């Protein structure tokens, strides 16, 4: 029951943030949406969008990790915000910025899925599929392909015929 409460809390946090961003997008207040995303980045990890895009993904993961454990709540929020940021850049006709946001978001979602198979309940897998669609015109970097391969290795068909995942050691 505690795990379900945790997952619901994550979903509520992400949902609230997205609702505000979607509102700004609908009224075409793109700068307002980007400012909100930047503020949420600062609240979550103590750094704004510019800093998050300037650091390596390894550094970002280190910022979201405590004692070797990825903070899934923060990682999920950051990944979702990066995807929303990419959508805004795409709406503004800035494909280079959209690509960077989408790619970092995709890699974070993949890391999340590889860390905790319980988060499939939040439809994180559909986020990955959506991002892969947005990035299909690009050749994915080797690290992203490695993460995808690891995820595909973890996928299996359960005895009841449903699709499931299991986590394998990545070290």
What would you call each of these model-derived segments?
Residues 1-78, 82-92, 99, 103-113, ...:
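N-terminal alpha-helical interaction modules that lie
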């Amino acid at each position: 029951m505690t795990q379900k409460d945790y997952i619901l809390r994550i979903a509520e946090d992400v949902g609230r943030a997205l609702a505000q961003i979607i509102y700004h997008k609908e009224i075409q207040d793109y700068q307002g949406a980007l400012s909100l995303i930047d503020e949420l980045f600062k609240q979550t990890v103590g750094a704004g969008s510019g800093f998050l895009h300037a650091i390596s993904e390894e550094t970002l993961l280190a910022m979201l990790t405590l004692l070797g454990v990825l903070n899934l709540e923060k990682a999920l929020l950051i990944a979702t915000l990066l995807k929303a940021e990419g959508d805004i850049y795409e709406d503004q006709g800035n494909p280079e910025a959209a690509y960077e946001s989408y790619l970092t978001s995709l890699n974070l979602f993949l890391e999340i899925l590889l860390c905790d198979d319980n988060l499939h309940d939040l439809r994180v897998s559909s986020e990955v599929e959506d991002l892969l669609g947005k990035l299909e015109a690009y050749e994915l970097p080797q690290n992203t392909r490695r993460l995808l391969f690891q995820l595909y290795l973890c996928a299996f068909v359960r005895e009841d015929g449903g699709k499931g995942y299991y986590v394998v050691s990545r070290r």
